[in-house]
Amino acid sequence: MLTSNIQKSIRNSYQNLQAQLDNFVPRRAQNYLVAEIAKTLCGQYHKSNRILVAEAGTGIGKSLSYLMAAIPVAVHNNRKVVISTATVALQEQLVNKDLPLFRRITDREFSFILAKGRQRYCCAEKLATASGVDGGQLAMFETKPKKKDIELLETMYRSLAQGKWDGDRDAWPKPIDDRIWQLIVSDKHSCNNSLPGHRGCPFQKARSELDKNDVIIANHSLVMADADLGGGVILPEPENTIYVFDEAHHLPHVARDHASASASLKGAAAWLEKLNQSISKFSSLADEKRVARFRNDLQDSVQNLIPALTQLTKQFDPAQFEEGIYRFEHGELPTWLENQSKELKQFSKKANQSVAKIADLIAERVKDGELAARLAEPALAELGFYIQRLENLAQVWHLMAEPTREKGAPLARWLETHPDREGDFIVSVSPLEIGWQLDQQIWSRCIGAVLVSATMRALNSFHYFCHQVGIDGKPESGTQFLALASPFDYQNQAELLIPAMKYEPSAPQFTEYLIEILPKYLEDKKANLVLFSSYWQMNQVAEALSSEFIKRGWALQVQGESSRQEILKKHKKLVETYKTSVLFGTGSFSEGLDLPGELLENLVITKIPFGVPTSPVEQAHSEYIEKKGGNPFMQITVPDASKKLIQSVGRLLRKERDSGRVTILDRRLVTKRYGQALIDSLPPFKRKIEY
């Protein structure tokens, strides 16, 4: 229930915000968003389904809105808040700017912490060994270590021991080489809380800190990893949590990637052979009587897996592959492969269970003081590596062996020729739809959830997004939907131009035509951004126009030629000195690129960003929709393009006083039946359509 206490707390923080910020402009949309989040989370619309899906345009102040509403509700009810983002940039903004600001303006005391995956932390015991503190140093290196590597490890060890560093890779003053990090990274098997020597490890300390905090900032991948473990393992349990998913439009893809699995055949056989040779070494560290059964089971499983995987590589004919890929239509496997998958599932599962049991028995002896930690550590780290690989292998064959579903979307299953190993194949499996899983793991269990993004709707509807993430969009379900327009005055600040064009992007002459007409739509002494749908076309146009741009005194920078940071730094310098700056970019430049004011006044989009279903998952999804009598182009491709186009045009106005022009060089917006729907889903720019 939305108590007067919570309402008062929210009102106070809003009033204090006005006092804190000199240039604060009260926004009705922000007020409304705060109120709707609070009402939804307090069960005012629906007692059990407390979910709000909100599209909030640029400039509304999304992050402060959900902090102002969700934190008072959670603290009042003694619950946790997990804020999940898709990018590091937004996490940094929340931790360094928004949360400290909210802490200053609220009357509620709360604590917050950034949660990271285990792989961001070092293991104190591994670091001690690698730096030579407890002997066994050289055994950790495959080749003789360089002097500077040893010196770095020693410095890191001292900093950790003296409390000057917390073991977080991102907190070390300089980047740490992957080669060094792999030696000391925490893994869930050797860096285990049940082992006395690891209770003070950086990861264990960070995890225990999570429990003490009210607000936890995570990323979508970490939330999915916790959900896969049953929830409440890495993060607080869903039943005690209010989730806020910012940049929520990324959630469907992150969730799908998380539920996918792949493994190479020869590659797996090779590391299984190494495991086979080490079984006796590992077993000798455990209690002989208790380990015997698991050692025998492991030997039996591994000795069945190696020939089966090797034999499988001879069953596939690369001549039947298209561009190195063979996809099983409708996810259906031939009977012989179905049977083989069931066997491989059995053996890999048995091997995984046996290795995990041997690791447990070794850890038990360390705990009981029967085995020195320094002898067990290297073995447990190595076993951790094998357990991780076996878990993945077991997951691949579990999904491959799963019977074809009578209802719902099938699994996408495919093979790829290995890019680096001749005669090897990668076996991959992915679900097509992940919504039901998100519902089971999160929506049906959590206290409440808020999903926000600047681009949530496709073609002015939330339907596509709801289907992707498994949220019931029917009015009677109780789910709340909100689409808040940006506070910008689009009509007076920006123009959308769709010029008359000789060719559409599908015409073979389009690239040549683009080279001919593009300079006409660029502005002298201004900041220009041109967005392409393909790297190939971008590079062709850049190459053809570079000499003309030099003649005109225009500075051209192309995505990929330098780091994004370097490109933007140079761009800023050019704009500050009143030079013409032209940026060429593709997909990743159409999202998350923040160029306010004079840093971007002219945006050109060369074509509607239609995705081509090239990946096996996209192809399988299209096939499934066709089988159901649907139209994949209208059901997947157009809604996806709509979201991407909204993101692209969103680069132009970043702050309330910004202005400029967007030109879209794709006549299909006018000539095709879906064109009007795409235009109508864009912000309400002043439109100029040439005929």
Predicted regions and their residues:
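Conserved interdomain hinge at the start of the Helicase C-terminal
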Residues: 440, 499-533
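Conserved helicase motor "Helicase C" RecA-like lobe of SF1/SF2 P-loop NTPases
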Residues: 533-560
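Walker A/P-loop
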Residues: 46-68
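A substrate-engagement module of RecA-like helicase motors
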Residues: 2-18, 47, 58, 78-81, ...
